[in-house]
């Protein structure tokens, strides 16, 4: 098993999620292959992997790093496969979960109603379908870091303005905006942000089976604790979502509605997902055990 890491060499003390995951992966028995942290050009891939030997048999690998463009992911995947090293998520599988509009048709009623638009002119019809207020995000990422007003529209005009801002930010949208039903999630206010936090949890899964999970938001309160029955119900929704997708390694964010039911907020590729409150040691030990089967 191999971890393809963009963490610095040697690993810094402390560090970000990439460093923490790399450290945990090595401790769990993964061999480390390094890629530059600032991998910007396709021409850099082959030189970066030049000293990596061809394996006698196909060896599974997990990439831990910064969000790559589609072309970069394909280039790294091809260079590794030439050495008989196979990323757990091939390029098509990576895109299925990383660009939410690809996953949405398979998730169906597990998640909020969603309409995908690629122009501002399509927004009014999308809003008519999902209703107001509506939540808008890019195909990749939202603007939650900029606050509630950067994501939630109460009028068609506001929705059009949010869509225009997302379409300008290709690193968030890749040219597509998701206009989503604003679900009645359980929400709590925190002093540090005007974006209300919910009872939302991130789950990492391999082949539909949970590896590890943790509270999503970077704030802790009594609302974050899960009872055994709640955890089982939440994980069941995450597992069902993962089983509907062809992608092997998946992150599923699950939130609780005001009526107590659980829904999928979004999905992603754990190779480039934040850990939230997931213990990296637990995650990578479980992943090592599953890949060794």
Task: Give the label of every model feature segment.
Residues 205-209, 257-260:
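Short acidic-glycine loop/turn motifs at beta-strand connectors
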Residues 32-35, 89, 116, 254:
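A structural preference for short, hydrophobic beta-strand core positions in alpha/beta folds
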Residues 1-86:
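ATP-binding N-terminal substructure of ATP-dependent carboxylate-amine bond-forming enzymes
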Residues 1-11, 15, 52-56, 76-192, ...:
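Active-site nucleotide/adenylate-binding loops and adjacent lid/helix of ATP-dependent enzymes
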Residues 114, 131, 143, 173-174, ...:
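Catalytic phosphate/metal-binding cores of nucleic-acid and nucleotide-processing enzymes, i.e., regions
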Residues 244-247, 256-293:
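C-terminal active-site "lid" helix and adjoining low-complexity regulatory extension at the edge
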Residues 209, 213-218, 267-274:
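Short beta->alpha transition motifs characteristic of CBS
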Residues 200-202, 253:
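Short, surface-exposed charged micro-motifs
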